[in-house]
């Protein structure tokens, strides 16, 4: 059976301690995988079966394994073969690095190797490398993280396990009123109070930025179009940089006095334009709309 037939993708992440398993797990979570850390091998098949019967709630399961004994390794190998026989076709990722780099990483965090015991750090690394040699030889993808930064490792994992949708930047465009305080979760904040306030237009006061009357008024003001064009150009630059650095969630906040007129109209228009840009998924939030 293929992935289409089983309805679920399965990945197994293993490798040497200090080679980047935690980073890989976080990246897979960001890509939409359901990640389980250190699940006993005998329970992996059950976990996958539950995911397959979740009616689409879980479509991608990744199991991150911290292998510490020979029996554990052999059990994992058997489970992978069993999953393959059932048609799940698990993709095995193995992470490694040179002894010198692994030693340096352990020394930086001042931790011992899980197999070190009373011996030297290098002995623990050697024991683990030997213990995992068979699993490494059977892996679908081996990544040497010796010379990779965190961002470079994430990029390689995205290439191997991501989809077009999961690697796109998710942008939240939020309107707010300064009278109610700045949004704490905003990455970028812009002040829209340079535009005339529709509040002072009696026939517009009771409307808001979602209404056509207010929208046309705000977008028709001198400077509104220039602001949108220039801000969108800035976001292309900033968004590309954030994407290279592995940032997949971006919150843009536009504020006016009460968060009812100017910021709402501009947020809706900006979101519409950004939605047309390749690589961005956009949603709008009007934090203070409806507040007195």
From Swiss-Prot:
The residues listed in the UniProt record as binding ATP, with positions renumbered to this chain, are 15-22
Q: Enumerate the InterPro entries for this protein.
A: P-loop_NTPase, RapZ-like, RapZ-like_N, RapZ_C
UniProt GO molecular function: ATP binding; GTP binding
Task: Kindly list the positions annotated as binding GTP.
Answer: 66-69
**Swiss-Prot/TrEMBL keywords:** ATP-binding, GTP-binding, Nucleotide-binding
What is this protein's function per UniProt? Displays ATPase and GTPase activities.
Give the family, as the similarity comment puts it: Belongs to the RapZ-like family.
**Which PANTHER family does the protein's record reference?**
RNASE ADAPTER PROTEIN RAPZ
Q: What is this protein called?
A: Nucleotide-binding protein SACE_2139
